[in-house]
Amino acid sequence: MVETKSIAPEFKKYLKFDSNNSNIRVGVAMSGGVDSSTVAYLLKQQGYDIFGVTMKTFKDEDSDAKKVCDDLGIEHYILDVRDEFKEKVVDYFVNEYMNGRTPNPCMVCNRYIKFGKMLDFILSKDASFMATGHYTKLKNGLLSVGDDSNKDQVYFLSQIEKNKLSKIIFPVGDLEKTKLRELAEQLGVRVYSKKDSQEICFVDDGKLKQFLIENTKGKAEKPGNIVDKNGNILGKHKGFSFYTIGQRKGLGISSEEPLYVLAFDRKTNNIIVGQNEDLFRDELIATRLNLFSVSSLEGLDNLECFAKTRSRDILHKCLLKKDGDNFQVKFIDNKVRAITPGQGIVFYNNDGNVIAGGFIEK
């Protein structure tokens, strides 16, 4: 138990002990970072019977998670998911880049690994719930945006199967990250000042090109031409797997005006570039939709809602039109910049609840 006298009044509500919680077993997904570590402290203080679980994925697991569990006097398990992670996340990641698409590995990992294999493991340990440090809420059984707009992670969780949400809790969804760090420091969490993890956990910062070369046995290096919209050759590229829609830096071409990657032509192996205004589109095709607030794809047809095409995007008003198993998404009030095939697209209602999540096809 933590001495709560040293805790600021604004945080006291997170530390209320309830003896009834001792009968509720919760597995905490622990990365070794400040978010999940603070979740473990809060649930322990609230009286839950908790244990920590850390996944062994592509790299060695973070030892800080074990240290935090030792500080709390709770069990810590290491779940080896290397084979599944390689198949479901890493191979997918590489294949998407090789096909001229920009993958979203966090979405895929959350569906199959974290809220798939890890959730199953936690429930097998007689736990009633799995807790994570995501800045997200559950409202009426649906995913909903967290209070910190800069850290809201519901976008990355939009591929979780709906029937699993009843087994998941997000204890810090109504906290801002800066406030969580303050609380963590006051609680004495050893990692309260630890830096946030990098976006792609299995690729070292600045080493994406090297990673793709190594994991494709050099096939990612497939030189071709950089052309304008009229097909005029402006320069050379070393392989379109190393580029993404909207990219400006690193093209190695000179122009009076800045040029950006607009598209990839797999047949010719060309990268097509243009000006910034050429990046704006008023529609896209969404595929592989995961449903939350509707029970069938037909429930989305002719639906007016809001969409995000990247995690820190603003909400764009849109209209959905069913097209087989896919959907045409028509943006109503404004065009959207740098729509990127392979990235996620998430649909929200007026209350910030997730209606469905999918991927951008084109």
UniProtKB/Swiss-Prot annotation:
Q: What is its EC number?
A: 2.8.1.13
GO CC: one term? cytoplasm
The GO molecular function terms of this record are: ATP binding; tRNA binding; tRNA-uridine 2-sulfurtransferase activity
Site positions for Interaction with tRNA: H134, Q343
What keywords are assigned to this protein? Answer: ATP-binding, Cytoplasm, Disulfide bond, Nucleotide-binding, RNA-binding, Transferase, tRNA processing, tRNA-binding
On whether Endoplasmic reticulum is a keyword of this UniProt record, the answer is no
Localization:
Cytoplasm
Q: Tell me the residue numbers annotated for binding ATP.
A: A29, M30, S31, G32, G33, V34, D35, S36, M55, G133
Q: Which reaction does it catalyse?
A: S-sulfanyl-L-cysteinyl-[protein] + uridine(34) in tRNA + AH2 + ATP = 2-thiouridine(34) in tRNA + L-cysteinyl-[protein] + A + AMP + diphosphate + H(+)
Biological-process GO terms, alphabetical: tRNA wobble position uridine thiolation
Disulphide bond pairs: C109-C201
Which Gene3D superfamilies does UniProt cross-reference here? Adenine nucleotide alpha hydrolases-like domains, HUPs, Translation factors
The record's section on InterPro entries has:
MnmA-like, MnmA-like_C, MnmA-like_central, MnmA-like_central_sf, Rossmann-like_a/b/a_fold
Q: Where is the active site?
A: C109, C201
* Stretches the record annotates as Interaction with tRNA: 151-153
Family statement drawn from the similarity comment of this UniProt entry: Belongs to the MnmA/TRMU family.
Q: What does this protein do?
A: Catalyzes the 2-thiolation of uridine at the wobble position (U34) of tRNA, leading to the formation of s(2)U34.
Q: What's the protein name? A: tRNA-specific 2-thiouridylase MnmA 1
Q: Which organism is it from?
A: Fusobacterium nucleatum subsp. nucleatum (strain ATCC 25586 / DSM 15643 / BCRC 10681 / CIP 101130 / JCM 8532 / KCTC 2640 / LMG 13131 / VPI 4355)
User: What is the organism lineage in this UniProt record?
Assistant: Bacteria, Fusobacteriati, Fusobacteriota, Fusobacteriia, Fusobacteriales
